[in-house]
């Protein structure tokens, strides 16, 4: 199955082509663990109180998992028409 990178309007056009009248939606299919990146967190300077107030959930999100969506799957990497079909209604 051939794969290619699809970004921006090319990705949208491909979704219209694959999904047709069914339409499409964004729904993350996979989750990626960002635990190995936690060492970089220790290199950041401490936040002042004002920044902590503006981003109260920052620490909770820092060690969480990132959802992998269609842009990461098809633009940052390559995907096939079969992958795209997973985003159809």
Curated annotation (Swiss-Prot):
Location relative to the cell: Secreted
GO biological process, one term: glucose metabolic process
Cysteines engaged in disulfide bonds, as pairs: 7-75, 19-88, 74-79
Alphabetical keyword list: Carbohydrate metabolism, Cleavage on pair of basic residues, Disulfide bond, Glucose metabolism, Hormone, Secreted
InterPro entries in UniProt: Insulin, Insulin-like, Insulin-like_sf, Insulin_CS, Insulin_family
Pfam short name (any one): Insulin
A GO cellular component entry from the record: extracellular space
Residue ranges annotated as propeptide in the record: 33-66
Alphabetized GO MF terms: hormone activity
Function statement: Insulin decreases blood glucose concentration. It increases cell permeability to monosaccharides, amino acids and fatty acids. It accelerates glycolysis, the pentose phosphate cycle, and glycogen synthesis in liver.
Subunit structure: Heterodimer of a B chain and an A chain linked by two disulfide bonds.
Family: Belongs to the insulin family.
Protein name: Insulin
Classification of source organism: Eukaryota, Metazoa, Chordata, Craniata, Vertebrata
Gene name of the record: ins
